[in-house]
Structure formats: C-alpha cells, structure tokens
C-alpha cells in the first residue's frame, strides 16, 4: 500500500496534473484561435467594457437567477467556490504546491478548511438531491451529471475522512489512496467534461464576442427558448 501511495503522490500526480493543464491550455488556444479567425480586426471594435462587465457580473450571479431555480442555482454557485478554494488553499494541499513550485503560498487554517470541506460536500449532496427529486431538474439532467457530481464528491469526502480518524471507516492508507486516485481522476476528466467551466469560467463568459450579443442577451435568449426551466 505504501508503494501505491508514493506512486499516487509522485509520478501519477504529476502526469494527471500535466494532462489537465495541457487539456485546459488546448481549450483556451482553440477558443482564442476561433475568435481571431472569425472576428479578426473586428475584435478591436468589440464592446469590451460591456463584455467584461457582463463576465464580472457572473462572479456574484444574483441578477442571472431565473425564478424557479434560485435555490438550486445558489447552491451550485456556492459549490463552485468550495470546489476551487479547498483544493487550492487546504494546508496539506498548499504544502504539496509549495514542494512542487518552490513557493511559500498561504493556506487556510485547518478548522476553516474542515468547515469549507463539509460545506462543499453538503452542496454536492443538495445538488444530487435536487437533480433526483425535482421534476424539472430531473428531466434536464443526464446520466453524466450524476456521475460527475459523485466523482467530485469522492475526493472531498475521502480527504475529510483521511484527516479525521474518528469518522474514517477504512485504514488511513486505503482512504488516502482513495482520495489521491479520485482527485487525479478528476484532473484527467476536467478538460474533457463540463468540469472545465469551473477553471475556464472567464473564457466561457466572454463568448458574447463570438455572437456580438448585447449584455444579458444570452440570458434572455435562453429563457425565451427554454422558459424558467433553463439551466443557470
């Protein structure tokens, strides 16, 4: 088991993290190439202030919430925060980043990190419940939506259990290996699934350049097509 742990911490972590970085870079290159090819010099005439303002408004997307999906959308928004902050700022993770990058990055206190981890787990469970039991969300959900939520839940739950022996049902080595492997599976999946939007948020939200839409037009078009059941 120790050999597997060392492999998961070392070569496998490096390989899967590299796959994620290269995959995300590929998506950025494709989007930038598409923009420059299709728009060319017209990019200089694009309404950049409106586009950037619209993208920034999604950082706290209160005005984008559509009636009937407010609770689901709010939980989804909060989940995204936890899904970014915990992997980047948890003290054990920061120690790993510092070892790899040779930096001295700040980290969350362990107590705060525990609460944020539990909060993120609760958000994932809530999203699963909504997709399962709310008819309008169930009809919009595909099998991949459920699978991805479960896969996202695994590294958070296993990491918390590994750090807290009193709630850990498995030997520490087994739980830590589960944590590492589930996280590394997500590394590989991120560039090839909708999980990429968590990382490429800004690039997703400036797609108005492609269509030369007025600010808020995307929301209005989606609501006109799909009504209140549109995904937010």
Spell out what each predicted region is.
Residues 1-232:
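Membrane-embedded alpha-helical bundles that constitute the cytochrome b-like, heme-associated redox core
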């Amino acid at each position: 088991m120790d050999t597997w742990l060392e492999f998961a911490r070392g070569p496998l972590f490096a390989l899967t993290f590299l796959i994620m970085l290269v995959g995300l870079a590929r998506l950025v290159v494709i989007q930038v190439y598409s923009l420059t090819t299709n728009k060319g010099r017209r990019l200089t005439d694009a309404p950049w202030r409106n586009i950037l303002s619209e993208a920034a408004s999604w950082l706290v997307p209160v005005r984008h919430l559509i009636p009937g999906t407010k609770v689901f959308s709010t939980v989804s928004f909060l989940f995204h925060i936890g899904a970014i902050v915990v992997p980047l700022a948890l003290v054990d993770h920061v120690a790993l980043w510092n070892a790899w990058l040779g930096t001295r990055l700040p980290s969350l206190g362990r107590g705060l990190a525990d609460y944020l981890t539990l909060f993120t787990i609760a958000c994932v469970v809530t999203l699963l419940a909504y997709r399962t039991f709310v008819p309008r969300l169930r009809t919009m959900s595909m099998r991949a939506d459920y699978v991805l939520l479960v896969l996202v839940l695994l590294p958070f739950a296993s990491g918390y259990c590994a750090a807290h022996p009193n709630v850990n049902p498995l030997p520490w080595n087994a739980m830590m290996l589960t944590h590492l492997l589930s996280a590394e599976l997500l590394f590989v999946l991120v560039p090839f699934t909708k999980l990429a939007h968590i990382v490429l948020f800004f690039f997703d939200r400036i797609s108005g350049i492609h269509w030369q839409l007025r600010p808020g037009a995307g929301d209005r078009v989606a609501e006109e097509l799909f009504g209140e059941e549109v995904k937010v």
